[in-house]
């Protein structure tokens, strides 16, 4: 007789080979055809809402691995929230305006760019952004990210542009918006002002020079030792090109300064920097006087090569960190210089044009590019005898985020949002303390930035963006930027988009009957600057959260890379607090950057770039999702082929566990066959205890956003508790009758384990969980993504049972080692060929005797004999004290059906090759 048909072997159509690169698109197509996200949204109606607001990626180029990390993290959180019973919508967005797109379009136009009107340029920029919105949307969807992809928010949509203009109008209404001349980060290559977030720092070698400014006023009355002497203040700078713009020298009011007599002249430096100055310049001299800075206040120095004075001022910004303690002050080229000049009534002088060249009228250097002029300025200083010393310094210097070229500080007429008006700075700092920051250091980072930042420069001298909706009276030059006018224009933009600004004349854009409040005339011209793109994305709380009924403000979470403390988190905070008084988010979570396996930054030149598309083609998006979950994303996140291969192996283990469970549930109906907990075997109850521990651990990991803990918990559960122990032991139940209590008990556990496992892993392994779900008996929903996490069952926790089974597992571990030794010595082949004798001390023996009937199953051997410690000379166990283990060939014949050896085989004439247990099972 063929007994194979009487065995309960695992049967399932669930494929062993994942074949993810081919299977995932099929699952994705099914989600789209069945409108899975729409179904989820309907199911969420009436549930408590959880809003994670999507920071918009830039609609330029294909997605990179950092995008994948970000979008998958968001997707994991939102899916976990839905499975916890929340209505958790996801509205993706794109940042569509700005310099990178405009520069790319200019590049594509080539020489034709000079013939292109602003309107034509904007049309091409819009088409370019639309193209990459479509490209990136498909790439994000391919990652398994569920969302309202058919209705994303775009910062270039008419309603978004209109709301952006409306938010600007609100700042005009509350007095926060103003126009002024201030030094701002300026890219002479891109010909525009830059926001703090558009500035990157890179190492640069700059000249380091010491320059003397001859004191014009005699201070002999206050410092007699200096009477009648030629006295100069020495400044230090790494930007010689700003010397032509010098208007002052700043000293610290609380510092002591020394007069060094050297070669017939006197040089003044801070006492605390005297030695460093002398070492750097080689100047030798004696200190002939020490005095406080205040005696020099408002005294006149002569500019080194221009016929004008440089005034001595006092400033708290002067430090002893480097230089001389006498600070070169050019109000048109530095924030602190500018602030001091405002207090002291100096001009905000800037002799540099938009393209980084000195104005033609500047004596000696007119028309020169500023960085090229460094050498010429130094030569001029040498010529007039003002150069005290020179060298070079390697330092971190600001560069443009887009063209990567060094930038300058340059005073220009710009539009600003005041940090002091309406107490914006203090209100923002207060709101920061009401937000939960993950990791916690995020709070200190953004707090320091807001505390020390200048007014927000929101104007850009480009074409592709939302115009600053201000007007100028052509008669008297008065600025018209009031709430009524700007709200009127915002309404026009809502209906027809911001291109109207370029299509219509000023008179067509203004409210009827508008006249200049200053002179009463009615002829106006339009402001041609556009808004900083960080203002665009910063008002998304108004344009998206408040504008879409399924969302709401403030959002529960903003989640982006750690660079966004100075970017989107920052601009969003100011935009919201500035008009509403509250932060737009309750919690902010940040992740690090993606680096290679050695921790190096990714770079095309190094050749270590890992593209999401390549990973998906080779491994599938599921492995990318597992990679995101497996990392502690709060630091920089490593990725390499080795890491991905390791994760692919972990994925296979999880998949195979699910497949094995499915295979053993092919004839199980949970409504009919489920065995109650109190009628299960001890081993089965042990498995449910472990399942409950897993559920608690995973739930906590989701709540704390510690997905690496979740990954290790699920992987460990599948590998250790299930495959290596529980599933290994219960395999023997395949020989039981179909409806045998012990088999149904194991099936009940396997069903509960699989149901929990598949829902717990669904936010991470979204494709596989849904694939497994499709094969499950009696699933509650059509997709796992419509299901909820399993309920907690605290009654399944049994610590005393776990302690007992920990002892059994320890004994099993030692038995396995003894079996391996016997295998090496050719005493046995398979473990079922073995009979094991355990000689144990009284306490352990008594404990093991309680499980005497189960030990052969637990050890996967044919027979186990328990004897007292002194009986027989067996080798001592490696781990468990008071235990000796003997292994011998099992007596009896091998059962044809279960492969156990048994001395009673042949006792049943109908089934002479079966053991009694199998003979009973087949009858």
Curated annotation (Swiss-Prot):
Localization annotation: Cytoplasm
GO molecular function terms noted in the UniProt entry: aminoacyl-tRNA deacylase activity; ATP binding; isoleucine-tRNA ligase activity; tRNA binding; zinc ion binding
SUPFAM superfamilies: Anticodon-binding domain of a subclass of class I aminoacyl-tRNA synthetases (SSF47323), Nucleotidylyl transferase (SSF52374), ValRS/IleRS/LeuRS editing domain (SSF50677)
Binding site for L-isoleucyl-5'-AMP: 560
Gene3D superfamilies found in the cross-reference section: 1.10.730.20, HUPs (3.40.50.620), Ile-tRNA synthetase CP2 domain-like (1.10.10.830), Valyl/Leucyl/Isoleucyl-tRNA synthetase, editing domain (3.90.740.10)
UniProt xrefs under Pfam families: Anticodon_1, tRNA-synt_1, zf-FPG_IleRS
CDD domains assigned to the protein according to its UniProt record, in alphabetical order: Anticodon_Ia_Ile_BEm, IleRS_core
UniProt cofactor(s): Zn(2+)
Residue interval(s) of motif 'HIGH' region: 57-67
Residues bound to Zn(2+): 895, 898, 915, 918
Binding site for ATP: 604
GO BP: isoleucyl-tRNA aminoacylation
Record motif 'KMSKS' region, residues: 601-605
Entries under PROSITE patterns matching the protein: AA_TRNA_LIGASE_I (PS00178)
UniProt xrefs under InterPro entries: aa-tRNA-synth_I_CS, aa-tRNA-synth_Ia, Anticodon_Ile_BEm, Ile-tRNA-ligase, Ile-tRNA-ligase_type1, Ile-tRNA_ligase, M/V/L/I-tRNA-synth_anticd-bd, Rossmann-like_a/b/a_fold
EC number(s) per entry: 6.1.1.5
Role: Catalyzes the attachment of isoleucine to tRNA(Ile). As IleRS can inadvertently accommodate and process structurally similar amino acids such as valine, to avoid such errors it has two additional distinct tRNA(Ile)-dependent editing activities. One activity is designated as 'pretransfer' editing and involves the hydrolysis of activated Val-AMP. The other activity is designated 'posttransfer' editing and involves deacylation of mischarged Val-tRNA(Ile).
UniProt free text on domains: IleRS has two distinct active sites: one for aminoacylation and one for editing. The misactivated valine is translocated from the active site to the editing site, which sterically excludes the correctly activated isoleucine. The single editing site contains two valyl binding pockets, one specific for each substrate (Val-AMP or Val-tRNA(Ile)).
Record's subunit section: Monomer.
NCBIfam families cross-referenced by the UniProt entry: ileS
Similarity annotation: Belongs to the class-I aminoacyl-tRNA synthetase family. IleS type 1 subfamily.
Protein name: Isoleucine--tRNA ligase
Species of origin: Geobacter sulfurreducens (strain ATCC 51573 / DSM 12127 / PCA)
């Amino acid at each position: 007789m063929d007994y194979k048909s009487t065995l309960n072997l695992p049967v399932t159509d669930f494929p062993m080979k994942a074949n993810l690169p081919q299977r995932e698109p099929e699952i994705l197509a099914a989600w789209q055809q069945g409108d899975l996200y729409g179904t989820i949204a309907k199911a969420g109606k009436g549930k408590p809402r959880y809003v994670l607001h999507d920071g918009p990626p830039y609609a330029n180029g294909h997605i990179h691995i950092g995008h994948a990390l970000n979008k998958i993290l968001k997707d994991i959180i939102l899916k976990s929230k839905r499975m916890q019973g929340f209505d958790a919508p996801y509205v993706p967005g794109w940042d569509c305006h700005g310099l990178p797109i405009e520069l790319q379009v200019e590049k594509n136009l080539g020489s034709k760019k000079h013939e292109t009107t602003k309107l034509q340029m904007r049309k091409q920029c819009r088409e370019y952004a639309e193209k990459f919105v479509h490209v990136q949307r498909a790439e994000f969807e391919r990652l398994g990210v569920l969302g309202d992809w058919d209705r994303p928010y775009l910062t270039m949509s008419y309603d978004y542009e209109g709301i952006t203009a409306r938010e600007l109008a609100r700042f005009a209404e509350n007095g926060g918006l103003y126009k002024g001349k201030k030094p701002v980060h300026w890219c002479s290559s891109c010909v525009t002002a830059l926001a703090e977030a558009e500035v990157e720092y890179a190492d640069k070698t700059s000249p380091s020079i010491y320059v003397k400014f001859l004191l014009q006023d005699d201070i002999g009355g206050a410092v007699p030792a200096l009477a009648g002497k030629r006295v100069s203040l020495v400044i230090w700078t790494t930007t010689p090109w700003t010397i032509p713009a010098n208007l002052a020298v700043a000293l610290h009011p609380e510092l002591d300064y020394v007069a060094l007599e050297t070669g017939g002249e006197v040089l003044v430096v801070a006492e605390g920097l005297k030695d460093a100055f002398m070492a750097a310049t080689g100047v030798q001299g004696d200190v002939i006087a020490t005095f406080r800075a205040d005696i020099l206040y408002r005294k006149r120095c002569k500019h080194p090569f221009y016929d004008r004075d440089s005034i001595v001022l006092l400033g708290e910004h002067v430090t002893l960190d480097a230089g001389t303690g006498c600070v070169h002050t050019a109000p048109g080229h530095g924030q602190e210089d500018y602030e001091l000049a405002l207090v002291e009534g100096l001009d905000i002088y800037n002799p540099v044009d938009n393209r980084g060249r000195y104005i033609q009228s500047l004596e000696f250097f007119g028309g020169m590019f500023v960085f090229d002029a460094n050498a010429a300025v130094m030569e001029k200083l040498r010529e007039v005898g003002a150069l005290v010393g020179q060298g070079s310094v390697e330092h971190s210097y600001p560069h443009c985020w887009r063209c990567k070229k060094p930038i300058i500080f340059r005073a220009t007429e710009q539009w600003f949002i005041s940090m002091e008006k309406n107490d914006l700075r203090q209100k923002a700092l207060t709101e920061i303390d009401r937000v939960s920051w993950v990791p916690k250091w995020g709070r200190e980072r953004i707090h320091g930035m807001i505390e020390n930042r200048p007014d927000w420069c929101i104007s850009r001298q480009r074409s592709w963006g939302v115009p600053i909706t201000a007007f100028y009276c052509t008669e008297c030059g008065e600025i018209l930027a009031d709430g009524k006018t700007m709200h009127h224009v915002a309404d026009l933009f809502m209906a027809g988009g911001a291109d109207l600004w370029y299509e219509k004349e000023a008179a067509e854009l203004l409210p009827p009957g508008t006249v200049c409040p200053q002179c009463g005339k009615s002829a106006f011209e339009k402001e041609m600057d556009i808004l900083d793109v960080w203002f665009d994305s910063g008002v998304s709380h108004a344009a998206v959260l408040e504008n879409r009924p399924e969302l709401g403000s403030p959002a529960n979470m903003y989640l982006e890379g750690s660079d966004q403390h100075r970017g989107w988190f920052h601009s969003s905070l100011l935009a919201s607090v500035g008009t509403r008084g509250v932060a737009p988010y309750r919690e902010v979570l940040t992740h690090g950057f993606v680096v290679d396996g050695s921790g190096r930054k990714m770079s095309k030149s190094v050749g270590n770039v890992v593209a999401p598309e390549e990973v998906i083609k080779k491994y599938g998006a599921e492995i990318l999702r597992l990679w995101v979950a497996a990392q502690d994303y709060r630091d920089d996140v490593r990725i390499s082929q080795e890491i991905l291969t390791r994760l692919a192996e972990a994925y296979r283990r999880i998949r195979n566990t699910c497949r094995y469970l499915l295979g053993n549930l092919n004839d199980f109906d949970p409504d009919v066959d489920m065995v109650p907990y109190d009628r299960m075997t001890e081993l089965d109850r042990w498995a449910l205890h472990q399942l409950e521990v897993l559920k608690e651990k995973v739930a906590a990991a989701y709540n704390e956003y510690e997905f690496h803990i979740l990954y290790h918990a699920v992987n460990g559960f599948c590998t250790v508790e299930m495959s290596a122990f529980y599933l290994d032991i219960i395999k023997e139940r395949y020989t039981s009758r179909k409806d045998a209590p012990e088999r149904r008990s194991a099936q009940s556990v396997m069903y509960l384990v699989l149901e929990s496992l598949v829902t717990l892993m669904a936010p991470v392994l979204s494709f596989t969980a849904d694939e497994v779900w499709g094969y499950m008996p009696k699933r509650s929903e059509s997709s796992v993504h419509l299901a909820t996490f399993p309920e907690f069952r605290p009654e399944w926790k049994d610590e005393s049972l776990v302690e007992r089974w920990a002892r059994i597992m320890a004994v099993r571990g030692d038995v396995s080692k003894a079996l391996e030794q016997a295998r090496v010595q050719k005493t046995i082949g398979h473990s079922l060929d073995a009979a094991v004798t355990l000689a144990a001390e009284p306490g352990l023996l008594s404990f093991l005797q309680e499980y005497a009937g189960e030990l052969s199953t637990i050890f996967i051997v044919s027979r186990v004999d328990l004897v007292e410690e002194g009986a027989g000379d067996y080798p001592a166990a490696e781990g468990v004290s008071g235990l000796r283990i003997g292994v011998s060939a099992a007596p009896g014949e091998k059962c044809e059906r279960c492969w156990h050896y048994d001395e009673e085989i042949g006792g049943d004439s109908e089934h002479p090759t079966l053991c009694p247990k199998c003979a009973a099972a087949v009858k």
